[in-house]
Amino acid sequence: MVLQKNWQSLIKPEKLEVEPGPVASRIATVVAEPLERGFGMTLGNALRRILLSSLQGAAVTAIQIDGVLHEFSAVPGVREDVTDIVLNVKQLALRMHGEGPKRMILTATGPGEVTAGQIQAGHDIEIMNPDLVICTLDDGVKLGMEFTVNMGKGYVAAAANRPEDAPIGLIPIDAIYSPVRRVSYKIEQTRVGQVTDYDKLLLTVETNGAVTPEDSLALAARILQDQLQLFINFDEPRPVQHEEPQDDLPFNRNLLRKVDELELSVRSANCLKNDNIVYIGDLVQKSEQEMLRTPNFGRKSLNEIKEVLTGMGLSLGMSVPAWPPENIEDLAKRLDETF
C-alpha cells in the first residue's frame, strides 16, 4: 500500500484538450492539466526531445538526374542548378507504407514549373506537399529524375546515404526523416478546487502532414514509456478484489456500503456529507478533480479516500452500471451482514 502511494497519490490529467492550428492536420496545441508542480517541465521537455529526434518517417536519400554526373553541375534548360534542386527535394514531405528503399520517377517537359505532384510515387508513397516546386524548365526542355526513398529517424548526412556500389550520377542528399518540424511548450499555473499551484502543460506541435500532431505526441509518449520500463524493478501489488456475485448484482457489493463506515477523518466525512455522498457507489463515480472542487476538501482528504478505496479494489472515476438500484436501501440492509 505504501509503495503504491508513490504514484497513486499524485494528481493526473483526466484527458487531453486539442486546440487545432491554422491547418489542423499539421499544427495543434495539446493541453494537459492538472499536473503536479514541476511535472509540466519534466514531461514537456522529454516529449519535445523525443518528438524532434525519435519518430520514424520517410525521406529522399538520393537522386539521379538524366545527363548529370554530380551535384555541382548545371542542367541545360533548367533555371536552377543541381544544388538548388537538391535543396528543394529536401523539403519533400512523404508518407511511406511499408519498408524501404522505394523508387519514385519524375518526367517533365517545359516550359513551366515542375512540382512534386508530377512525381510518379506509386501506391506505397504519398506526397504530402504536391505543390512544392522542384525546378523550372525552359521551353522544349525534357527532364528525367529518379528518387530513392527510405524510412528512418532523425537526421542522416548525405555521406551516410551513399551506398558502396553507387552508380555514376547518383547524388546522395541529407535525409531529414522526422515528420515533426517544430515543437514548443510552455507551462502555466492552474487550479483544482482550493489548490492553485498545479501545472498546465501546453505543447504546440507542427508536422509535415505525414502524421497528425496528436498522433505524433502519442507515439512520443509510447517511446518514453517503453524506455522507462526497464527502470521499474518491482512487481505492483494487486489490490484485494471483493467482487463475488451476490443476488445477481451487476456491481461490486462494497458499493452498497455507506461512506460513514469507512472510518474517515472528521473533515473528510463532513465534506462527503455536505456533498450528499451517501454510499460508496456514489463516491467512486466522482473524479479526483470533482472531489477537489468540493469546499474544504483538500489533497490530504483525497489521498485518504483513495487509499481506503484501493484496499477495497475500488477507485475514483469508476463507471458503475445500473447505479443506483431502485431498492438500494433494502439491498444495503440485506447485504450488511456480509461485510
Curated annotation (Swiss-Prot):
One example of a Gene Ontology biological process annotation: DNA-templated transcription
Classification via CDD domains: RNAP_alpha_NTD
Keywords from the named record: DNA-directed RNA polymerase, Nucleotidyltransferase, Transcription, Transferase
Gene Ontology molecular functions: DNA binding; DNA-directed RNA polymerase activity; protein dimerization activity
Pfam family, one: RNA_pol_A_bac
Record SMART domains: RPOLD
Chain intervals for the UniProt region annotation (Alpha N-terminal domain (alpha-NTD)): 1-235
Enzyme category, top tier: transferase
E.C. number: 2.7.7.6
HAMAP family found in the cross-reference section: RNApol_bact_RpoA
Record-stated family: Belongs to the RNA polymerase alpha chain family.
Subunit and interaction comment: Homodimer. The RNAP catalytic core consists of 2 alpha, 1 beta, 1 beta' and 1 omega subunit. When a sigma factor is associated with the core the holoenzyme is formed, which can initiate transcription.
Function: DNA-dependent RNA polymerase catalyzes the transcription of DNA into RNA using the four ribonucleoside triphosphates as substrates.
Comment text on domains: The N-terminal domain is essential for RNAP assembly and basal transcription, whereas the C-terminal domain is involved in interaction with transcriptional regulators and with upstream promoter elements.
Full protein name: DNA-directed RNA polymerase subunit alpha
Annotated organism of origin: Gluconobacter oxydans (strain 621H) (Gluconobacter suboxydans)
